[in-house]
Every structure is written in structure tokens, then in C-alpha cells.
């Protein structure tokens, strides 16, 4: 796996403030980052630019995170991109659904600091 500076992280998050916090934290760690503020933009960005990993909110405008994840996992060019769901939905049904559709992890925003999210990404990409 490449070093941090060659790793491209796509953050799909409609909360602009929160997206900026994650973006700055990843950039401080040397990652290349882009942000999409709705599900349709996130899917389009993933299909065009093939990020190394995607952080995906579930409650998104235009297309929810579950629908984005399903489309990513059914696409020939995107099915192998690891996706971490990063959301406020903490019900067991939501966690189970996200993992069943193909997410590699499911993080509840309130339970993880941005630095811990970066650590999770590093672990998934074998950079830790």
C-alpha cells in the first residue's frame, strides 16, 4: 500500500463543518482528500477518481449512504474500494445493514475523534 501522501480519501458528508474537520485531519497526516456533500456527488467522485478509501455518511441528501454503498459495491470499477460508514445512526439494524451491504467498518461519529477515524483508515489500508 502507498504511503499516506499517495492515499486518496473521499469523504462523503453533508455537514460542512464536520467534513472540514475530517479533511484537515487527514491532510495533516499527509493524505490527499476530497469532499462530496451529497450521495450523488460522492458516487460520481468515486466512479471518476477511484479513491483508496471512502468515508461515507448515511443520512445524505439526494441519495442516502446505503444506496451509494450498494451502487459502489455493484460497480466493476468501485466494488473493491473499502468503505467505512461514518454516521450518527447507531441502531443495530443500521450497523448490520451497512456491514451486510459491504462496508468494512461502521463508526458512530459521536464515539470517535477525528484522529481515531484516521487511525481506522490507516488500519484498513495497512498503513498503521
Locations of regions flagged by a protein language model:
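The short loop immediately C-terminal to the conserved phospho-acceptor aspartate in CheY-like receiver
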Residues: 32, 58-59, 73, 84-85
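Two-component/phosphorelay signaling modules centered on CheY-like receiver
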Residues: 16-34
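Conserved acidic carboxylate
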Residues: 13
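The feature encodes the CheY-like receiver
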Residues: 19, 61, 70, 79, ...
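Active-site beta3 strand of CheY-like receiver
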Residues: 49-55, 60
Amino acid at each position: 500500500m502507498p504511503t499516506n501522501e499517495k492515499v486518496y480519501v473521499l469523504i462523503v458528508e453533508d455537514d460542512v463543518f464536520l467534513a472540514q474537520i475530517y479533511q484537515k485531519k487527514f491532510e495533516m497526516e499527509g493524505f490527499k482528500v476530497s469532499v462530496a456533500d451529497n450521495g450523488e456527488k460522492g458516487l460520481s467522485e468515486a466512479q471518476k477518481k477511484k479513491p483508496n478509501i471512502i468515508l461515507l455518511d448515511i443520512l445524505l441528501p439526494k441519495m442516502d449512504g446505503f444506496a451509494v454503498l450498494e451502487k459502489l459495491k455493484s460497480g466493476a470499477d468501485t466494488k473493491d474500494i473499502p468503505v467505512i460508514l461514518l454516521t450518527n445512526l447507531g441502531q443495530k439494524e443500521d450497523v448490520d445493514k451497512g456491514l451486510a451491504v459491504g462496508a468494512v467498518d461502521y463508526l458512530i461519529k459521536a464515539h470517535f475523534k477525528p484522529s481515531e477515524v484516521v487511525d481506522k483508515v490507516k488500519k484498513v489500508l495497512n498503513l498503521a
